[in-house]
Amino acid sequence: MIMRPDFAEGVRAAVRAWGLGNCARRSSLYSDTVTAVVVEPGFDANRIIQAAYHNYGVSLGAGLGKVAGKVFRIGHLGWLNEPMVLQALGGVELAMRDCGVNFTAGSGVGAAIEHYTDRREPLALAAE
């Protein structure tokens, strides 16, 4: 398993930009493999999960146990790159828009882009 803490922080930046919460209440509890996004009270997070999958082909995890229906999970581990994470975040934004979640469209993707470009080292090209 490849854990990507930098990708995780980009996802957390998106969650903050959406005005939603992280299920982990302290940063010391944040995971480098998955972020559980807390939706507004009374809203069923499973609606977002279903819309993301059926409308955009994006697979999100469901909340389990006490957080069932209260969170959706975004994974950020394995063979990923920044565009793949941004694509997933875009799919989440589309699904949230479909479900009537109140947020500024593009805010999460934009926050992740800012995070990734602020910390990225340029790739060395073979021709250089």
What are these regions (language model features)?
Residues M3-V11, S31, D44, I48, ...:
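General structural feature for long, well-ordered alpha-helical segments within catalytic domains
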Residues L20, G57-V58, V101:
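Short aromatic/hydrophobic-glycine micro-motifs
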